Amino acid sequence: MPHPLLPDITPVAASTAAAHGFELVEIQILTHLQPMTVQVQIRRTDGSDVSLDDCAGFSGPMGEALESQALLTEAYVLEISSPGIGEQLQSDRDFQTFRSYPVEVLYRDDEGREQRQQGSLLERNADHVQVNVRGRIKRIARASVISVQLISPTG
Protein backbone atom coordinates (compact mmCIF):
# COMPACT_ATOMS: atom_id res chain seq x y z
CA MET A 1 0.00 0.00 0.00
CA PRO A 2 1.45 3.39 -0.95
CA HIS A 3 2.33 5.79 1.82
CA PRO A 4 -0.50 8.27 2.53
CA LEU A 5 1.84 11.26 2.00
CA LEU A 6 2.83 10.14 -1.50
CA PRO A 7 0.08 12.19 -3.24
CA ASP A 8 1.32 15.32 -1.42
CA ILE A 9 5.05 14.70 -1.90
CA THR A 10 4.94 13.62 -5.56
CA PRO A 11 4.03 17.07 -7.00
CA VAL A 12 6.73 18.69 -4.84
CA ALA A 13 9.31 16.23 -6.15
CA ALA A 14 8.10 16.57 -9.76
CA SER A 15 8.24 20.37 -9.75
CA THR A 16 11.64 20.41 -8.02
CA ALA A 17 12.98 17.93 -10.57
CA ALA A 18 11.59 19.96 -13.48
CA ALA A 19 13.14 23.15 -12.11
CA HIS A 20 16.56 21.46 -12.20
CA GLY A 21 16.33 19.85 -15.66
CA PHE A 22 15.11 16.45 -14.53
CA GLU A 23 11.96 14.40 -14.80
CA LEU A 24 10.59 12.53 -11.80
CA VAL A 25 10.51 8.81 -12.60
CA GLU A 26 9.36 7.41 -9.29
CA ILE A 27 9.16 8.24 -5.62
CA GLN A 28 8.81 5.77 -2.77
CA ILE A 29 8.55 6.19 0.97
CA LEU A 30 9.93 3.19 2.85
CA THR A 31 8.65 3.27 6.41
CA HIS A 32 9.97 -0.17 7.36
CA LEU A 33 13.48 1.30 7.56
CA GLN A 34 14.75 3.30 10.54
CA PRO A 35 14.84 6.16 9.89
CA MET A 36 12.33 5.99 7.07
CA THR A 37 13.72 6.45 3.57
CA VAL A 38 12.41 8.65 0.77
CA GLN A 39 13.68 7.31 -2.56
CA VAL A 40 13.48 9.65 -5.55
CA GLN A 41 14.37 8.45 -9.05
CA ILE A 42 15.10 11.07 -11.70
CA ARG A 43 16.12 11.17 -15.34
CA ARG A 44 17.36 14.06 -17.46
CA THR A 45 14.75 15.74 -19.62
CA ASP A 46 17.21 15.85 -22.53
CA GLY A 47 17.66 12.06 -22.42
CA SER A 48 21.32 12.12 -21.41
CA ASP A 49 22.59 9.98 -18.56
CA VAL A 50 22.19 11.03 -14.94
CA SER A 51 25.57 11.08 -13.20
CA LEU A 52 26.44 10.58 -9.56
CA ASP A 53 27.22 14.31 -9.41
CA ASP A 54 23.72 15.04 -10.75
CA CYS A 55 22.18 12.95 -7.97
CA ALA A 56 24.35 14.58 -5.32
CA GLY A 57 23.60 18.05 -6.70
CA PHE A 58 19.85 17.42 -6.77
CA SER A 59 19.78 16.06 -3.22
CA GLY A 60 20.11 19.54 -1.66
CA PRO A 61 17.26 21.23 -3.57
CA MET A 62 15.04 18.17 -3.13
CA GLY A 63 15.71 18.08 0.62
CA GLU A 64 15.01 21.81 0.90
CA ALA A 65 11.74 21.41 -1.00
CA LEU A 66 10.61 18.60 1.30
CA GLU A 67 11.58 20.57 4.40
CA SER A 68 9.81 23.73 3.21
CA GLN A 69 6.56 21.79 2.79
CA ALA A 70 6.87 20.28 6.30
CA LEU A 71 5.09 17.13 5.14
CA LEU A 72 7.44 14.67 6.83
CA THR A 73 7.29 14.98 10.60
CA GLU A 74 9.83 12.31 11.50
CA ALA A 75 13.47 11.75 10.62
CA TYR A 76 14.14 10.41 7.13
CA VAL A 77 16.94 9.57 4.73
CA LEU A 78 16.68 11.05 1.24
CA GLU A 79 18.06 8.87 -1.58
CA ILE A 80 18.38 10.24 -5.11
CA SER A 81 19.05 7.84 -7.98
CA SER A 82 18.33 7.19 -11.63
CA PRO A 83 16.52 4.15 -13.02
CA GLY A 84 18.88 1.30 -13.71
CA ILE A 85 18.91 -2.04 -15.44
CA GLY A 86 15.98 -4.23 -14.54
CA GLU A 87 13.41 -1.51 -14.95
CA GLN A 88 10.19 -2.09 -16.80
CA LEU A 89 9.72 -0.10 -19.96
CA GLN A 90 6.45 1.80 -19.92
CA SER A 91 6.48 5.09 -21.77
CA ASP A 92 7.05 5.66 -25.49
CA ARG A 93 10.24 7.44 -24.48
CA ASP A 94 11.45 4.31 -22.63
CA PHE A 95 10.92 2.23 -25.76
CA GLN A 96 12.80 4.75 -27.91
CA THR A 97 15.65 5.17 -25.42
CA PHE A 98 16.22 1.43 -25.01
CA ARG A 99 15.84 0.43 -28.66
CA SER A 100 18.29 -2.43 -29.44
CA TYR A 101 18.79 -3.22 -25.74
CA PRO A 102 18.18 -6.77 -24.49
CA VAL A 103 14.67 -7.18 -23.08
CA GLU A 104 12.32 -9.85 -21.83
CA VAL A 105 8.72 -9.57 -22.95
CA LEU A 106 6.09 -11.22 -20.76
CA TYR A 107 2.89 -11.81 -22.72
CA ARG A 108 -0.16 -14.05 -23.06
CA ASP A 109 -0.29 -16.39 -26.05
CA ASP A 110 -3.45 -17.20 -28.02
CA GLU A 111 -4.46 -19.79 -25.40
CA GLY A 112 -4.04 -17.29 -22.55
CA ARG A 113 -0.83 -18.84 -21.17
CA GLU A 114 1.96 -16.57 -19.99
CA GLN A 115 5.02 -16.71 -22.23
CA ARG A 116 8.44 -15.06 -22.05
CA GLN A 117 10.48 -13.95 -25.03
CA GLN A 118 13.98 -12.53 -24.81
CA GLY A 119 15.66 -10.56 -27.55
CA SER A 120 16.80 -7.11 -28.64
CA LEU A 121 14.09 -4.48 -28.60
CA LEU A 122 13.30 -3.16 -32.07
CA GLU A 123 10.22 -1.05 -31.48
CA ARG A 124 6.80 -0.67 -29.95
CA ASN A 125 4.05 0.74 -32.12
CA ALA A 126 0.28 0.98 -31.72
CA ASP A 127 -0.18 -2.70 -32.58
CA HIS A 128 2.97 -4.67 -31.70
CA VAL A 129 6.16 -4.95 -29.73
CA GLN A 130 8.92 -6.16 -32.02
CA VAL A 131 11.95 -8.04 -30.73
CA ASN A 132 14.94 -9.39 -32.65
CA VAL A 133 15.47 -13.01 -31.57
CA ARG A 134 18.74 -14.33 -33.03
CA GLY A 135 18.21 -12.47 -36.31
CA ARG A 136 14.47 -13.14 -36.61
CA ILE A 137 11.84 -10.54 -35.88
CA LYS A 138 9.22 -11.63 -33.35
CA ARG A 139 6.07 -9.49 -33.37
CA ILE A 140 3.96 -9.68 -30.23
CA ALA A 141 0.53 -8.08 -30.22
CA ARG A 142 0.65 -5.10 -27.88
CA ALA A 143 -2.70 -6.09 -26.35
CA SER A 144 -1.11 -9.40 -25.26
CA VAL A 145 1.95 -7.82 -23.64
CA ILE A 146 1.99 -7.87 -19.85
CA SER A 147 5.41 -6.25 -19.38
CA VAL A 148 8.68 -5.46 -21.11
CA GLN A 149 11.75 -5.40 -18.89
CA LEU A 150 15.40 -4.62 -19.51
CA ILE A 151 17.70 -7.55 -18.81
CA SER A 152 21.44 -7.98 -18.69
CA PRO A 153 23.03 -9.01 -22.01
CA THR A 154 23.58 -12.54 -20.71
CA GLY A 155 19.91 -12.85 -19.71
Curated annotation (Swiss-Prot):
GO terms for biological process: ribosomal small subunit assembly; translation. InterPro entries: Ribosome_maturation_RimP (IPR003728), RimP_N (IPR028989), RimP_N_sf (IPR035956). It is found in: Cytoplasm. Its main location: cytoplasm. Pfam families: RimP_N (PF02576). It comes from the Bacteria. Keywords: Cytoplasm, Ribosome biogenesis. One of its GO terms (cellular component) is cytosol. Belongs to the RimP family. HAMAP family: RimP. Required for maturation of 30S ribosomal subunits. This is Ribosome maturation factor RimP. It comes from Synechococcus sp. (strain WH7803).
